[in-house]
Amino acid sequence: MKLNIHLISHPLIQNLSSITRNSYSSYNMMNQYFKSLGLLIIYETIRTWTKIHKLTIKTTKKEKELIIIDPKESYTIVFDNLDYVNMFQDIQFILPKLNLKLIEQKNEKNYTLFNFSPNIHHRILIVNYRMDTKFIKNLIEGLIREHNIKLKQIRLTCVECKTEQLIQLSELYDNLTIYTTKIINT
């Protein structure tokens, strides 16, 4: 298996993923759990991907240091369930040039609706709560074929996945990077 699999072991993320899998809390509480989980998982997924620049601004009286995200970089978070849009709303305030894209599984061919030009600075994050290999395969194939996206520009994030799903993906995509909180042995 040639996949780059990162098992997210941060205690807060593990706790939130467990709560979202097993809780029967109110809608408002679950919504808050999903928001927090989404923010933390996206953080873990892109922290090594994001490039920053340190700028020093000198005036006659003082010197300020600013840290900015590379302005050439842009991101698209692709997800398959409208209920998960709340997971990513807060990230839009933190990460510049972020697009959210809902692709419903009913229309597997709507990956052609992406409206971005393929460039090496564009990064695509596919998010599934529970990994769906059919959806992921169709989406990645469409991105590669229709938009000339390179596999290194794509990362996959899910709360849980099965070993057989990872094996299926490894047979198709060398070096796909996957972040997950739980791998279920099947």
PLM ranges: what are they?
Residues M1-T186:
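PRPP-associated nucleotide enzymes
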